[in-house]
Amino acid sequence: MSLDAADITVKLGRTPILHGIGFCAKPGEVSAIVGPNGSGKTTLLRAITGDLPFDGTVRLNGKDTSRMKPWELSAIRAVLPQSAVLAFPFTVAEVVRLGVQAGVCARDCDAPMAALSQVRLAHYADRFYHELSGGEQQRVQLARVLAQVWRPVVGGAPRWLLLDEPVASLDIANQLEVMEITRAYASAGGGVVAVMHDLNLTAMFADHLAILSGGQCLAAGPPEQVMTDAILSQAYGCALRVNTPPPHSATYVLPHAANRL
């Protein structure tokens, strides 16, 4: 039971975007996809979710996703896009309930309010979604996908959170909270795949990561093995040093030292 993507190739028109990438994620782990802008992170995730045409194969819990019906997929995996635009004035509770409807699981009818409570927005349930800040909207969308696959394991099979930059517009406290939610989901037996830009948060929370560069996978493995000076410098095109404080006693703030109040 895992998520296995093999030889993923994506072209936009005649332009190759991904070049035969392989990617594997296991339940019980947080798997991250990192890399510079334009490296193919979101494209890889959208290929995995079936939102882009691609060559190659994606297997989820042993099944070829190209042979699965939409309702079968929505019952075992929930997708958080980078952004979501709603054309109608839904309340926060209505947005989150969309997740339960997509998940096709009536037994999770209490999941929407539980998910809103988990992201600390239960008191916003009756507010209109469009009235919220960008960061609050992102947390509502996270609650929606949590509600869709609320129980991390069903019938002995893991369920999956597929998240595209889940902390991009959040402050540090909410970033930590969201990543702790993903860690708890994985610890309960579910699988998490997240596209990330913040390397510090990735190092803190990811069990496994793939580093993309130029549409190829430059390295994959545990953070302590692949987050090296050489690999990161090659991927990002600038000299980077791991576990090195800034020179000349410069002020710096790391999430590693934070404790949420």
From Swiss-Prot:
Q: Name one GO cellular component term.
A: plasma membrane
Enzyme Commission designation:
7.6.2.-
InterPro entries cross-referenced by the UniProt entry: AAA+_ATPase, ABC_transporter-like_ATP-bd, ABC_transporter-like_CS, P-loop_NTPase
Pfam families, alphabetized = ABC_tran (PF00005)
Q: Which family does it belong to?
A: Belongs to the ABC transporter superfamily. Heme (hemin) importer (TC 3.A.1.14.5) family.
Q: Which GO terms describe its molecular function?
A: ATP binding; ATP hydrolysis activity
Q: Where in the cell is it found?
A: Cell inner membrane
What is the purpose of this protein? Answer: Part of the ABC transporter complex HmuTUV involved in hemin import. Responsible for energy coupling to the transport system.
Q: Which residues cross the membrane?
A: none
Question: Quaternary arrangement and interactors, per the entry?
Answer: The complex is composed of two ATP-binding proteins (HmuV), two transmembrane proteins (HmuU) and a solute-binding protein (HmuT).
Q: What is its main location?
A: membrane
Source domain of life: Bacteria
Database matches in CDD domains: ABC_Iron-Siderophores_B12_Hemin
Name of the molecule in the record? Hemin import ATP-binding protein HmuV
